[in-house]
Amino acid sequence: MRGRSYTPSPPRGYGRRGRSPSPRGRFGGSRDSDLPTSLLVRNLRHDCRQEDLRRPFEQFGPVKDIYLPRDYYTGDPRGFGFIQFMDPADAAEAKHQMDGYLLLGRELTVVFAEENRKKPTEMRTRDRGGRSNRFQDRRRSPPRYSRSPPPRRGRRSRSRSRGYNSPPAKRHQSRSVSPQDRRYEKERSYSRSPPHNGSRVRSGSPGRVKSHSRSPRRSVSPRKNRSYTPEQARSQSPVPRQSRSPTPVPRGAQNGDRSPSQ
């Protein structure tokens, strides 16, 4: 019993004791590794070299690397650089002391670098992909760009629907009416109006209305109809109507009346 109870207990206790210091050591080591060791130095002259930066910064501790990025296409310096220290404490001290330092006639701005040094290939992909990512972000961001256009489209569609169904479309048609069509509308109104005089009723015959629809220029204006007297209109209009009428009864009656007279 003692052997059974004793044998499992040491591994459990040992395992617990062994697990407890390990996270402490991990957290302690992670704190040292997570602290920044790289500094971003801005406002550098274009002719600044690595030796010009190494001399003033090495007084705070050993410097691991100095990087002055250049444009991938032109090869010109960008006016900033990265300095990486071996110890995070040295980097913090250098940042505090060198911020605002005059180097080659320019006041430096020193801050902690968010990322470590990148290779030229990474800088090239970043330059090329920066523009495309911006457009992708604009396409993906729904609140600014996807929600704003629909109300504008809705307004345009409403305005168009109103334009087709509302009276403004009639106004557009009334503006496009030519003076010849206006004359035709006046003649129509005369033909539809109740007959005040015989001349107006006879002048608005259906045959003439059809001629107006085909060739409005040759149509007779209502002013000329007004100049005719009722006697002239009666003498001219009944003759074609009697000739076109298909009823043969009056002709037989006329022949019968003439036979006894002869």
From Swiss-Prot:
Region (Disordered): 1-38, 115-262
Gene3D superfamilies: 3.30.70.330
Compartments where found: Nucleus speckle
GO biological process, alphabetically ordered: mRNA splicing, via spliceosome; RNA splicing
Keyword Nucleus listed: yes
Biased composition (Basic and acidic residues): 115-140, 180-190
UniProt main location, coarse: nucleus
Molecular functions per Gene Ontology: mRNA binding
Domain of life: Eukaryota
Protein name per Swiss-Prot or TrEMBL: Serine/arginine-rich SC35-like splicing factor SCL30A
Source organism (scientific name): Arabidopsis thaliana (Mouse-ear cress)
Record lineage: Eukaryota, Viridiplantae, Streptophyta, Embryophyta, Tracheophyta
